[in-house]
């Protein structure tokens, strides 16, 4: 089974993917027949260009031409069949590529990325898909908190990137919401916690995903407020 977790940068894809894996481990066990039950991969690894090249070409990572979508679909289909793949690895800290890695699928593969539902070929690789659509201001806070802590950016640089990427988000990322089986929406609550709303559009059992969304809500911490002009 292949589960796709899709959304903009900073929308909570990594947190939700980890929560889904944790729910699977809690409900059905973490391992079976000597191997991990869940394999998780980041589809940012399929960027076509490193950070410096994207800057030279004036492309954002959200643009389809900036990603190896055909190879992504090929590898997802192979993992769905139970076959191993040798995939690229993108290093977010340095904005470069690390050596390729060998991936053997578990019973369940969780693939998270920006454009996982962009093409029909990609969509056909998934058994269940989730789109993360948090409140825009919350997403900005999450992205600033992550990118300043883990990727070496200043808050001002993150805000500039968000502004620059907004058109590509609206053009390429947001429309994928229509193809998702489950849409998860977080928003700030007056008491400082987060509210959670879901839109389920499938008859499949999605109880693990919904439990994971609640688990992720409990783990999420709102970052400090950001300027309105960053929106």
Listing of model-derived features with the role each one plays in the protein:
Residues 21-39:
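Post-Walker A helix-loop "phosphate-sensing" segment adjacent to the P-loop in P-loop NTPases
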Residues 167-231:
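NTP-dependent small-molecule kinase module
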Residues 9:
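The conserved Walker
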Residues 98-151:
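ATP-dependent NMP and nucleoside kinases share a basic, alpha-helical "lid"
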Residues 16:
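Hydrophobic positions on the alpha1 helix immediately C-terminal to the Walker A/P-loop
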Residues 13:
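Conserved lysine of the Walker
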Residues 39-42, 48-94, 108:
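Conserved nucleotide-sensing/catalytic segment adjacent to the nucleotide-binding pocket
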Residues 2-4:
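Short hydrophobic/aromatic beta-strand immediately N-terminal to the Walker A/P-loop
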């Amino acid at each position: 089974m292949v589960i796709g977790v899709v959304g903009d940068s900073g929308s909570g894809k990594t947190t939700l993917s980890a929560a889904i894996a944790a729910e699977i481990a809690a409900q059905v066990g973490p391992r079976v027949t000597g191997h991990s039950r869940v394999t998780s991969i980041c589809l940012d690894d399929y960027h076509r260009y490193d950070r410096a090249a994207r800057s030279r070409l004036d492309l954002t990572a959200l643009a389809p031409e900036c990603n190896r979508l055909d190879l992504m679909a090929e590898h997802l289909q192979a993992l769905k069949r139970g076959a191993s793949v040798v995939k690229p690895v993108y290093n977010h800290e340095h904005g470069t590529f690390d050596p390729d890695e060998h991936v053997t699928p578990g019973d369940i593969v969780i693939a998270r990325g920006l454009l996982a539902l962009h093409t029909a070929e990609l969509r056909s690789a998934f058994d269940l898909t989730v789109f993360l659509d948090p409140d825009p201001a919350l997403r900005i806070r999450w992205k600033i908190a992550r990118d300043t802590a883990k990727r070496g950016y200043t808050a001002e640089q993150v805000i500039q990137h968000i502004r620059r990427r907004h058109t590509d988000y609206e053009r390429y990322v947001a429309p994928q919401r229509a193809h998702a089986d489950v849409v998860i929406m977080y928003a700030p609550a007056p008491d400082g916690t987060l509210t959670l709303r879901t839109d389920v559009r499938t008859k499949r059992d999605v109880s693990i995903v919904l439990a994971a969304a609640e688990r992720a809500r409990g783990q999420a911490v709102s970052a400090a407020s950001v300027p309105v002009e960053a929106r």
